């Protein structure tokens, strides 16, 4: 039978004692309490020892009780002064009592019949009575003395003198449960103990042991790597935040430039008009977007850019006939929380880009929706675009698939034809979630020339807008999008780290 060093030492000492209190066994072995308890439990599992436990309710002194045991109960201190002087005022009592003790003790002296109370010249006077002169030790005094002598006394013993609730009421004593442990050797333990050879175990192989050759003489401690241990929850990043940081880092490593963002609020010009989305499009109504009550309107960019966008809408650019309506600058000036990250792509293109160039942003967007496990009204979106001479639709599909497979960990991805006012051709990307089935991630396409030429770009631009929250559901293995922003401590502790 294989025993650790602590188990061997504990068994040898227990064989000498046969039966001992746990504290006695700790003293005999010279080991720490934790080490002895681990050894006893190990010996018990091997049938070599038995651990007996008996729980009992006891009473011990509080800090207030310890003070009273040393200087006396307040009523006895007050009575001693009364016996010396015959009668006292409240100011006199303050010589021996604290302000907290004064009021209740005056009432107690009166209740016990140890003093009479009267008013004289506007002052409260206490005068000792015959009963006060003859007062003797009471049950509470004997209980206090017993607790001071023994430190810990069983409840049943205290109850013979006074109810424990009375000690609690006066904050003299407190009740707790203590467990007395006794360890006993078994016949199998008695048989094995004389045969045990006690060798000091070594838990670390040091250079000195190797050089001296003493490693041949020592016994190495065995470790059970499967033994259960206390779980530790070290500090870590919020899981979703860690995922976003990983995405950002990965895109930068791939050569993308992160677009800077000034505000969550945009004009409809950047949300829609600059993207060649007509002002009568249903997606611009209150059912699909939020609007600001105050301030209601913002400012349009430089006049030349506004004029090109207006022309694209009314008459068309790059061979297009446009949307054929009268474009309203007042409508374009209306303010709203950003409805999609593509608004930032439009801003960046108008500001100027490197050609070829790759750009991205991870931003909060807002849309009216019904909250459920796959929809939020405020969520994060990753938008990006690549601009270059030779770009085509196949490049776009390759980038999207790489996103879903490599970054989100999706196993199956599919693309469906779609329609967006500002891209042509357009595509919708979905990935398969083991719990939710096919989940839409977002849309993508090649920006229409009516949009890019109005913004001053003459080469192809492939772009996408992806719900990064849904990508995170795959990577973090959750089936409810609301968990990404959860305060659930258990989920925050146990959610896997994303690298």
UniProtKB/Swiss-Prot annotation:
Major location category of this protein: cytoplasm
EC top class named in words: ligase
UniProt source species: Thermococcus gammatolerans (strain DSM 15229 / JCM 11827 / EJ3)
Family: Belongs to the class-II aminoacyl-tRNA synthetase family. Phe-tRNA synthetase alpha subunit type 2 subfamily.
Residue sites binding L-phenylalanine per the record: 342, 381-383, 422, 447
CDD domains, sorted: PheRS_alpha_core
GO molecular function, one term: magnesium ion binding
Domain of life: Archaea
Subunit relationships: Tetramer of two alpha and two beta subunits.
Cofactor dependency: Mg(2+)
Descriptive protein name: Phenylalanine--tRNA ligase alpha subunit
HAMAP family: Phe_tRNA_synth_alpha2
A single Gene Ontology CC term: cytoplasm
InterPro entries the record matches: aa-tRNA-synth_II (IPR006195), aa-tRNA-synth_II/BPL/LPL (IPR045864), Phe-tRNA-synth_IIc_asu (IPR004529), Phe_tRNA_ligase_alpha_bac/arc (IPR022917), Phenylalanyl-tRNA_Synthase (IPR002319), WH-like_DNA-bd_sf (IPR036388), WH_DNA-bd_sf (IPR036390)
Catalytic activity: tRNA(Phe) + L-phenylalanine + ATP = L-phenylalanyl-tRNA(Phe) + AMP + diphosphate + H(+)
GO biological process, one term: phenylalanyl-tRNA aminoacylation
């Amino acid at each position: 039978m294989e025993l650790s060093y602590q188990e061997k030492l504990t068994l040898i000492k227990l064989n000498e004692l046969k039966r001992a209190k746990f504290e006695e066994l700790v003293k005999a072995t010279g080991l720490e309490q934790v080490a002895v308890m681990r050894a006893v439990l190990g010996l018990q599992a091997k049938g070599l020892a038995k651990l007996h436990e008996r729980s009992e309710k006891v009473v011990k002194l509080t800090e207030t009780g310890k003070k009273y045991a040393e200087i006396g109960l307040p009523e006895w201190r007050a009575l001693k002064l009364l016996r010396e002087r015959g009668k006292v005022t409240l100011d006199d009592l303050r010589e021996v009592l604290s302000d907290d003790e004064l009021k209740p003790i005056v009432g107690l002296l009166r209740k016990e019949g140890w003093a009479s109370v009267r008013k004289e010249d506007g002052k409260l006077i206490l005068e000792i009575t015959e009963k006060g002169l003859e007062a003797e030790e009471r049950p509470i005094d004997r209980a206090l003395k017993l607790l001071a002598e023994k430190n810990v006394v069983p409840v049943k013993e205290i109850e013979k003198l006074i109810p424990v609730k009375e000690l609690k009421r006066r904050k003299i004593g407190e009740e707790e449960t203590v467990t007395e442990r006794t360890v006993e050797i078994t016949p199998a333990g008695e048989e094995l103990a004389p045969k045990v050879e006690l060798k000091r175990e070594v838990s670390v192989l040091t250079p000195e042991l190797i050089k001296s050759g003493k490693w041949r003489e020592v016994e190495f401690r065995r470790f059970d790597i499967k033994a259960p241990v206390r779980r530790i929850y070290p500090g870590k990043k919020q899981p979703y935040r860690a995922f976003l940081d990983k995405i950002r880092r990965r895109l930068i490593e791939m050569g993308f430039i992160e677009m800077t963002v000034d505000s969550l609020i945009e004009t409809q010009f950047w949300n829609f008009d600059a993207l060649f989305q007509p002002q009568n499009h249903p997606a611009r109504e209150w059912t699909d977007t939020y609007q600001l009550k105050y301030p209601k309107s913002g400012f349009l960019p430089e006049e030349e850019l506004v004029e090109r966008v207006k022309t694209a809408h009314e008459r068309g650019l790059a061979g297009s006939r446009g949307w054929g309506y009268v474009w309203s600058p007042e409508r374009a000036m209306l303010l709203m929380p950003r409805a999609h990250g593509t608004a930032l792509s439009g801003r960046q293109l108008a500001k100027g880009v490197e050609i070829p160039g790759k750009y991205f942003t991870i931003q909060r967007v807002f849309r009216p929706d019904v909250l459920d496990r796959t929809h939020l009204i405020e969520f994060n979106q990753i938008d990006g675009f690549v601009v270059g001479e030779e770009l085509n639709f196949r490049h776009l599909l390759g980038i999207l698939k790489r996103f879903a497979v490599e970054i989100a960990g999706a196993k199956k991805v599919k693309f469906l034809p779609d329609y967006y006012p500002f891209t042509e051709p357009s595509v919708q990307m979905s990935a398969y979630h083991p719990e939710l089935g096919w989940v839409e991630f977002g849309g993508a396409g090649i920006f229409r020339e009516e949009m890019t030429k109005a913004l001053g770009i003459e080469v192809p631009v492939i772009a996408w807008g992806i719900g990064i929250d849904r990508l995170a559901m795959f990577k973090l293995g959750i089936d409810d999008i609301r968990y990404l922003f959860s305060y659930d401590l258990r989920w925050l502790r146990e959610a896997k780290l994303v690298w």
